[in-house]
Amino acid sequence: MRKFNSHSIPIRLNLLFSIVILLFMTIIGRLLYMQVLNKDFYEKKLASASQTKITSSSARGEIYDASGKPLVENTLKQVVSFTRSNKMTATDLKETAKKLLTYVSISSPNLTERQLADYYLADPEIYKKIVEALPSEKRLDSDGNRLSESELYNNAVDSVQTSQLNYTEDEKKEIYLFSQLNAVGNFATGTIATDPLNDSQVAVIASISKEMPGISISTSWDRKVLETSLSSIVGSVSSEKAGLPAEEAEAYLKKGYSLNDRVGTSYLEKQYEETLQGKRSVKEIHLDKYGNMESVDTIEEGSKGNNIKLTIDLAFQDSVDALLKSYFNSELENGGAKYSEGVYAVALNPKTGAVLSMSGIKHDLKTGELTPDSLGTVTNVFVPGSVVKAATISSGWENGVLSGNQTLTDQSIVFQGSAPINSWYTQAYGSFPITAVQALEYSSNTYMVQTALGLMGQTYQPNMFVGTSNLESAMEKLRSTFGEYGLGTATGIDLPDESTGFVPKEYSFANYITNAFGQFDNYTPMQLAQYVATIANNGVRVAPRIVEGIYGNNDKGGLGDLIQQLQPTEMNKVNISDSDMSILHQGFYQVAHGTSGLTTGRAFSNGALVSISGKTGTAESYVADGQQATNTNAVAYAPSDNPQIAVAVVFPHNTNLTNGVGPSIARDIINLYQKYHPMN
C-alpha cells in the first residue's frame, strides 16, 4: 500500500494562496488603472452611455440685391417640437397626441389610409388580434419560424379593412398629431404641424411640457420668395417633411446634416446652400439608468445663416425688363412677334464677370401672356446668327488659315451641286476684296465660309467639289475656338443646371459651313454675353457671377457686415495675339460707327450716350404657318475704349424681317446703365 505524504499539503496550500494573492493584486492593479490612472477616459465612456446629442437647424440667411433690397424673407414663428426617446411606445405617442390636441388647433387634417392603419394598430391588443388572425403564410416563413416584426407589421397593415378605420373628425386630428410624432426617429427632434400658435397656447404648452414627454416650444421659420423680376433665379427650399433630396442625402449626411433638414433645391438657394444654411443648435439628452429620457439641455445655441448680396441692382433689372416688354409689345402690335417665344438680354461687367442684369420676357404662344423669365437667359438656347463671326475669324487665326487683317474676295460661293451661298449684299454689289475688319462691319457670310474651308485644308474655287475627309477635325477646331469664348460650353456662372447650349454631335458639311456664320449650333443669351464680354476684355474669359459677396447679420437679423468679397474667376484666354484682338475691336467699332452703305449696326450708335462697339446677328428660321422669321440678335460693349458693360440681346422668331430691333435694344440697355451707373 502506497504511503500518503502529509508534508506535501502545506506546499500545495502555499501555492494556492500565492495564486489567489496574485489574482487579487491583478484585480487591484486593474482597478487602480481604471479609477486613478485612466479615470477621465472611463468617466467619459460612462457619460456617453447615458447621454446623446441631437442637432436642429436654424433659419437660413437671406438674399439681397446689389442695393440691399431683400429678394427673400424669413417669417419666424413659434411651433411645437417633439424629441423622441428610444423608450416611447406607440401607446405613449397616442397618449401624448391626445393631450397635445387639447392645447393646439388642427383645421383640416389630411390623412392617408396608411396613417389611419398605423394609429389603429398602435393599440397593442388590436395589433395582437390582427396578427393572430393572419393566415400562417403571413406569420411564418417556409421553415415554420415567425416572420420578422417589420414583415408581420406590414402584413397586419395590409389586412386592415377600410371599414375598421372609421374615425370622427376629432379622432382624425389626434391621428394627425400621432402620425407626426411617430415619424420622428429615436433621439431626433421634429416640428409638429399645427395651426399657428397664439401667445396663450405657447405659454400653456411651455408650462406643462413635462406632462407630455418630449414636447417643447421652439422657433421655426417660413421662407418666402418676394415677387420681383429675379424670383425665378432665387430657387426653392425643401420643407422639413421632405428634408434632404433623396439623390443627395448621403452627401449631405456626411457634412453633418440631418435627414429632415431644409436645404436649397434649386438655383441660388442650392448654389449657396452651405453659406445660407444656419448654424445648428446642439442639445444633449440625458438618460437615467433605465434608459429613460431624464432631461434635455442646450449646449450650443444655433444662429441664422449668412446672407448673400447679388451683383444685380433690382432697379436696373426692372428697367431692363420694362424696356424688353415695351419693345416686345411694339413688335406684337405690328405683327412681328406673334410667333416669338419672347425676348432676352444679359448685361455683364466684362472685367469682373459681375452680372448686371439677366432679363427675359416670356411670351406664351397659346394665351399671349407676357411674364418675367430671367432664368431663361441660362436655360433657353437660340440660333445666334452673325454675332459669332468674330469667333470664326479667331479660329482662322488660331489654325493658320488667316493672317491679321487678311483680304479675301467677297463673292458668291458655289459648291458643286449646291445652291449659292451669299452675303446679304452679294447680288447687289457682286465680288470685291474685303478685310477681316470689313467682314465684321458688313457681316460677310462668304468670308466666314472661306475661313471654314481653310480649316478643312481647302481653298475656295468656283463650282469646286469639297472633300469631307477633314470635316470632323475642322468642326472640332471651329467649336474649340467658339468654346474659348464661352460658346457651347459651361460659362462658369454661379448657378446650377445652366444649359451649355445645343451642339449636335451629328452634322453634315452644310451644317458645318453654316455654323461658321451662326446658323447651326444654339447658345444661351448668357453664353452670348460672355462671348462679347471676352472680346471687350481683350480675350480674357471671366465666369459670370451673380453673387457679389457674403454678409453677416445685424442686430435685427438683417444684412450685416461683409464677410467675404467674391473674386472674379478667370476661365481662359483666347489663343490669339493682341494685334489680332485689336482687329476684332476695330471691326466691332466699325459695325456701330462705319460710314459705308454696307455698315450693319449704326443703330447701336444712333442716340447712344456713350461710344458703343457691337455686332448684329440675324438667324433665319420659319414659324408655324411656314412664314419666314429671323432671330434678331445683337452683342455690344461700351464704352468702346474702356468697356464696363457687355450686352447680349436675343429676339427669336420675329417675322418683321426689315426691323432689326436687336441693336436698338442693346443701345437702350447701355443708355439705361449709363443713367444708373455713369461710366467714364
Curated annotation (Swiss-Prot):
The keyword DNA-binding does not apply. It is found in: Cell membrane. The keyword RNA-binding does not apply. The chain crosses the membrane at residues 9-29. The active site is at S386 (acyl-ester intermediate). Residues 30-680 are extracellular. Keywords: Antibiotic resistance, Cell membrane, Cell shape, Cell wall biogenesis/degradation, Membrane, Peptidoglycan synthesis, Transmembrane, Transmembrane helix. Disruption phenotype: Essential, it cannot be deleted. Cells depleted of PBP2b continue to grow more slowly than wild-type until at least 12 hours after expression stops. Cells form very long chains and have an altered shape, becoming lentil-like rather than ellipsoid. Cells are more sensitive to amidase and have an altered stem peptide composition. Disulfide bonds: none annotated. It is a single-pass membrane protein. GO terms for biological process: cell wall organization; peptidoglycan biosynthetic process; regulation of cell shape; response to antibiotic. Interacts with MreC in the elongasome. Comparison of drug-sensitive and drug-resistant protein structures shows the active site is highly flexible. This is Penicillin-binding protein 2B. It comes from Streptococcus pneumoniae (strain ATCC BAA-255 / R6). The lineage of its organism: Bacteria, Bacillati, Bacillota, Bacilli, Lactobacillales. The gene is penA.
